[in-house]
Amino acid sequence: MNTQQLAKLRSIVPEMRRVRHIHFVGIGGAGMGGIAEVLANEGYQISGSDLAPNPVTQQLMNLGVTIYFNHRPENVRDASVVVVSSAISADNPEIVAAHEARIPVIRRAEMLAELMRFRHGIAIAGTHGKTTTTAMVSSIYAEAGLDPTFVNGGLVKAAGVHARLGHGRYLIAEADESDASFLHLQPMVAIVTNIEADHMDTYQGDFENLKQTFINFLHNLPFYGRAVMCVDDPVIRELLPRVGRQTTTYGFSEDADVRVEDYQQIGPQGHFTLLRQDKEPIRVTLNAPGRHNALNAAAAVAVATEEGIDDEAILRALESFQGTGRRFDFLGEFPLAPVNGKSGTAMLVDDYGHHPTEVDATIKAARAGWPDKNLVMLFQPHRFTRTRDLYDDFANVLTQVDTLLMLEVYPAGEAPIPGADSRSLCRTIRGRGKIDPILVPDPAQVAEMLAPVLTGNDLILVQGAGNIGKIARSLAEIKLKPQTPEEEQHD
């Protein structure tokens, strides 16, 4: 980036010229790392801390960011401001040291809000589909030559990064409702994909509180802003009269302003028509499977159409869409002869979905695209509270696969809850009489326990939000083949 470009970018956020050094506590999180990446490319001195390296920290270190793999008071020395993720507790040594040194400590969303303040902000919120929709909007704007800045919660595969600094006036960002921090954002356009009960500890277990928080988020739009909302979602339909801003609705519903019609899935692609008010219909080929992704695309098209982006750019972007990391992510197709001696192959797909609605959408996409495949799921429940609160929903959804292997619950810092564990969930599913789940007590046993259930015409879904993504990549690296003791020792 040359000096003239950097000066232009720094002028976008004039008040932040007083800030020299920004330190991120929990920098390895996708949301934190994305903001750090944008700020590093804007020319700020960035440092951060986390407990272990990962692809996010490696990408940042490649940009010259200093990262400490520990949490120590001295890490915040000389910082102008400390940015903290919601996963970091108030007694973290770096947070304590920052307060003692009178260094401002702000949440991730507050920094994102500063980046958005002097740009045309487009924020994507909702219980499900945020990451993919953010990537779709970003892809369309990039294809149209608008060079947007984007900050996403997942890897945008076409760009190879979670975030990118553009030279245009647009900032496209995933908005996180999990800790209600999206209330800091003041975008020009907001998408709400759906609203379901999740992260209810943030909302005191009160769904009305969650709904009102989404309304408050939309009221951060200026009176001339626009809310783009999925009218198929019953909660959104209920809330529409309370939005108080210009709205565009989308969905399969007949009264949607942007309506999906004639949906058909062929393998990994969706084909459908979009009907828009006062515009010609367009026939879309979307390089992403599932009716849920058609809805995500409809949201992106609604925003792009409002901005005046031409249909050709929209259609090119959706047909060439490369997806996001861990969202129906194809990791390969592997011959089974070395795995269990059988002929044929098994496809391996990695997916982040960890709420029953998301898991259901992934299963439906797999069934629609590959109806003849033996559907095998390796599932890792995420959080004891979510497993408890959505226990019956999980039990119902998980019976839809042909074979289910289940890892222990990924705690995400939570204490175990009696009856909300994987063994109990397996027992409940088994009692329904449709499938016989297999509990995998040790992640090291996954390949060994997976091999015998593969038939030679399989689609393996590795599903969950904990550390199961690493397990998926490991399975791809070993091509599903269980390792002998000698091979493990060599590794």
UniProtKB/Swiss-Prot annotation:
<keyword id="KW-0067">ATP-binding</keyword>
<dbReference type="Pfam" id="PF02875">
    <property type="entry name" value="Mur_ligase_C"/>
</dbReference>
<dbReference type="GO" id="GO:0009252">
    <property type="term" value="P:peptidoglycan biosynthetic process"/>
</dbReference>
<dbReference type="GO" id="GO:0051301">
    <property type="term" value="P:cell division"/>
</dbReference>
<dbReference type="GO" id="GO:0008360">
    <property type="term" value="P:regulation of cell shape"/>
</dbReference>
<keyword id="KW-0436">Ligase</keyword>
<keyword id="KW-0547">Nucleotide-binding</keyword>
<keyword id="KW-0132">Cell division</keyword>
<dbReference type="Pfam" id="PF01225">
    <property type="entry name" value="Mur_ligase"/>
</dbReference>
<comment type="similarity">
    <text>Belongs to the MurCDEF family.</text>
</comment>
<protein>
    <recommendedName>
        <fullName>UDP-N-acetylmuramate--L-alanine ligase</fullName>
        <ecNumber>6.3.2.8</ecNumber>
    </recommendedName>
</protein>
<dbReference type="InterPro" id="IPR005758">
    <property type="entry name" value="UDP-N-AcMur_Ala_ligase_MurC"/>
</dbReference>
<keyword id="KW-0963">Cytoplasm</keyword>
<comment type="pathway">
    <text>Cell wall biogenesis; peptidoglycan biosynthesis.</text>
</comment>
<dbReference type="Pfam" id="PF08245">
    <property type="entry name" value="Mur_ligase_M"/>
</dbReference>
<dbReference type="InterPro" id="IPR013221">
    <property type="entry name" value="Mur_ligase_cen"/>
</dbReference>
<dbReference type="GO" id="GO:0008763">
    <property type="term" value="F:UDP-N-acetylmuramate-L-alanine ligase activity"/>
</dbReference>
<keyword id="KW-0133">Cell shape</keyword>
<keyword id="KW-0573">Peptidoglycan synthesis</keyword>
<dbReference type="InterPro" id="IPR036615">
    <property type="entry name" value="Mur_ligase_C_dom_sf"/>
</dbReference>
<feature type="binding site">
    <location>
        <begin position="126"/>
        <end position="132"/>
    </location>
    <ligand>
        <name>ATP</name>
    </ligand>
</feature>
<dbReference type="InterPro" id="IPR000713">
    <property type="entry name" value="Mur_ligase_N"/>
</dbReference>
<dbReference type="InterPro" id="IPR050061">
    <property type="entry name" value="MurCDEF_pg_biosynth"/>
</dbReference>
<dbReference type="GO" id="GO:0005737">
    <property type="term" value="C:cytoplasm"/>
</dbReference>
<keyword id="KW-0961">Cell wall biogenesis/degradation</keyword>
<dbReference type="InterPro" id="IPR036565">
    <property type="entry name" value="Mur-like_cat_sf"/>
</dbReference>
<keyword id="KW-0131">Cell cycle</keyword>
<dbReference type="GO" id="GO:0005524">
    <property type="term" value="F:ATP binding"/>
</dbReference>
<comment type="function">
    <text>Cell wall formation.</text>
</comment>
<dbReference type="GO" id="GO:0071555">
    <property type="term" value="P:cell wall organization"/>
</dbReference>
<dbReference type="InterPro" id="IPR004101">
    <property type="entry name" value="Mur_ligase_C"/>
</dbReference>
